[in-house]
From Swiss-Prot:
Localisation per UniProt entry: Plastid, Chloroplast
Keyword annotations: Carotenoid biosynthesis, Chloroplast, Isoprene biosynthesis, Magnesium, Metal-binding, Plastid, Transferase, Transit peptide
GO cellular component, one term: chloroplast
EC number of this enzyme: 2.5.1.-, 2.5.1.1, 2.5.1.29, 2.5.1.10
Temperature-dependent activity: Optimum temperature is 40 degrees Celsius.
Recorded metabolic or biological pathway in which this protein acts: Isoprenoid biosynthesis; farnesyl diphosphate biosynthesis; farnesyl diphosphate from geranyl diphosphate and isopentenyl diphosphate: step 1/1; Isoprenoid biosynthesis; geranyl diphosphate biosynthesis; geranyl diphosphate from dimethylallyl diphosphate and isopentenyl diphosphate: step 1/1; Isoprenoid biosynthesis; geranylgeranyl diphosphate biosynthesis; geranylgeranyl diphosphate from farnesyl diphosphate and isopentenyl diphosphate: step 1/1
UniProt-annotated binding residues for isopentenyl diphosphate: K119, R122, H151, R170
The encoding gene: GGPS
Protein function: Catalyzes the trans-addition of the three molecules of IPP onto DMAPP to form geranylgeranyl pyrophosphate.
Organism encoding this protein: Hevea brasiliensis (Para rubber tree)
Protein name listed in UniProt: Geranylgeranyl pyrophosphate synthase, chloroplastic
CC cofactor: Mg(2+)
Positions contributing to Mg(2+) 1 binding: D158, D164
Subunit note: Monomer.
Length: 370
């Protein structure tokens, strides 16, 4: 997992600033190690209203400022602690949202898959996007939970015998293995319905217009223009020799990226983001959504079932077209790095400290091992 050292970023920017003052009134630097390629740091040399009269005075003033920066560096971003804290909050909210009640069987089935663990990447992205545009956790937590409920529904249905026929998910037997196909289908249906109820009823301190907009975004992300579209084309493409890169991208943008995109966009809308901010984050999310699937394809052929917590090599067995199958492992990895870079470029112009979680999440998705 990668993290962003904001302290090093700010300190290096400062040193570059000082080095250029004696050479030019205005220069622009693009930091070579900075993942935000399009974020150029412009150092404008402004005339002081009270000019310093000597070179020694300038040096003394700069040394004092540099010493102050070194003594009080901005804290680096701790991605592991961030995900642990967000994960705990999300798990508590999910636990409270769906208590064990009658009818017991359906609630047991819903909770079995929903609370089985998982990386909680989608709800974390929702919360991070909300905070990036000036909101807080409480404004987006119901939406974050709703996204995780819908994601869980998609996994339950995806594992069914009529779909991928899988028996392992998150290191445990799949829902239909434990509760039967009939209850598994109904558990997925119930999670889907309750997700929208939860956003509508539990979202507080957000205007009704923004809540309605968020509901519309989420519905579009998972319907016939989103997740379902990707799943249908994926099923129809099994065993086909006519699946090219364009069709594969369509499958994964819809089947995987659309829900990740929805998570980020919901957070931005509910947090009070402007239309411009929402669209930048939409593009960021689409890139990391496709990135997630490219990495998933790579892991499917390079890791074991034990390492993944789900059945490895199942796409190969089902004769599905994947990025490694079309591009090879190394070219797939290069494509993943390209998507990661392009995603992070969309965060240029946002507060770097607030953008740090989204940068780190993109790096995590790119370099995850399961």
């Amino acid at each position: 997992m990668s993290s962003v050292n904001l302290g090093s970023w700010v300190h290096t920017s400062y040193v570059l600033n000082q080095a250029t003052r004696s050479r030019s009134k205005s220069k622009s630097f693009s930091l070579p190690f900075n993942p935000l390629k399009s974020l150029a740091i412009s150092f404008a040399y402004r005339k002081s209203e009270r000019p310093i009269s000597s070179v020694s005075a300038i040096i003394t003033k700069e040394e004092e400022t540099l010493q102050e920066e070194q003594n009080n560096p901005p804290p680096s971003f701790d991605f592991k602690s961030y995900m642990l804290q967000k994960g705990n909050s999300i798990n508590q909210a999910l636990e409270a949202a769906i208590p064990l009640q009658e009818p017991a069987k359906i609630h047991e089935s819903m909770r079995y898959s929903l609370l089985a663990g998982g990386k909680r990447v989608r709800p974390a992205l929702c919360l991070a996007a909300c905070e990036l545009v000036g909101g807080n956790d409480s404004m987006a937590m119901p939406a974050a939970c709703a996204v995780e409920m819908i994601h869980t529904m998609s996994l339950i249905h995806d594992d069914l015998p009529c779909m991928d026929n899988d028996d392992l998910r998150r290191g445990k037997p799949t829902n239909h293995i434990v509760f039967g196909e009939d209850v598994a289908v109904l558990a997925g249906d119930a999670l889907l319905a309750f997700a929208f109820e939860h956003i509508a009823v539990s979202t507080l301190n957000v205007s009704s217009a923004r809540i309605v907009r968020a509901v519309g975004e989420l519905a579009k992300a998972i319907g016939a223009e989103g997740l379902v579209a990707g799943q249908v084309v994926d099923i129809n493409s099994e065993g086909s020799s006519e699946v090219d890169l364009e069709k594969l991208e369509f499958i994964h943008i819809h089947k995987t990226a659309k829900l990740l995109e929805g998570a980020v966009v919901l957070g931005a809308i509910l947090g009070g983001g402007t239309d411009e901010e929402v669209e930048k984050l939409r593009k960021y999310a689409r890139d990391i959504g496709l990135l997630f699937q490219v990495v998933d394809d790579i892991l499917d052929v390079t890791k074991s079932s034990q390492e993944l917590g789900k059945t490895a090599g199942k796409d190969l067995v089902a004769d599905k077209v994947t990025y490694p199958k079309l591009l090879g492992i190394e070219k797939s990895r290069e494509f993943a790095e390209k998507l990661n870079k392009e995603a992070q470029e969309q965060l240029a112009g946002f507060d770097p400290e607030k953008a740090a979680p989204l940068i780190a999440l993109a790096n995590y998705i790119a370099h995850r091992q399961n």
